[in-house]
Amino acid sequence: MNKALFSFEFFPPQTAEGVVKLAATRKQLAQLKPEFFSVTFGAGGSTQERTLETVQQIKAEGHNAAPHLSCVGSTRENIRTMLNTYKDMGITRIVALRGDLPSGMGSIGEFQYANELVSFIRAETGNHFHIEVAAYPEFHPQARSAQDDIRNFKRKVDAGANSAITQYFYNADSYFHFVDQCGKLGVTAPIVPGIMPIVKFAQLARFSDACGAEIPRWVRRTLEGYGDDVESVQAFGLDLVTRLCERLLGGGAPGLHFYTLNQAAPSLAIWQRLGLPK
């Protein structure tokens, strides 16, 4: 069995205070020796400059960075420029996504789907970049069917993606079923589960409603029952997500990718509960 790989996702801070806080978060999480830190791109590429700045800071600290690139709002020339910039910086990993269309933006851009972006990256840069793509164990909310969604995922891998990071989920069976179905189509690329620590229920419910991630009914009802009792929400969430991670790793998941929301403590608590090495 190969060693499990771990990674953490950040979003580019909007304020000077946020930059300082994220630097402190990185310092804490860097002690865990992750494979990389990924940096989001914002809806329609809205954080492009701040994404680049955050990636530069991560590189300057001696860590591996994986910037996100998205189809939405991007032109071929724009993507080409960013690829060359990242290549010159020594970046070797990219997360290629379709991305979210901001309200008011009428056109998605020159790339319609993530597989087109993956193909373009390969055509422009050969095998320089390890390309990560998104996977949806509970299926993309815009997919016509589960089978169609898996075929779409296969197109991204066939276009040149090396591995995938999933949308977060709280039902391990959905992940194992998705991996099994991908395997039946001949997809062998590693599919790393995305992990969302539970910190605030209202925030989690808002994210989940927006992205189509399912909160199991019993989990939702339990969290709702805690009301404003933040300590109970977080204690329950820690137990739930730790058990999820244990089952995923025990079932052969190749690693875990934590959606940190720029906070170290929730991911560290799960890490420590899992008994993973520092």
Feature map (PLM): residue ranges:
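Conserved, mostly hydrophobic/aromatic
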Residues: 9, 37, 86, 156, ...
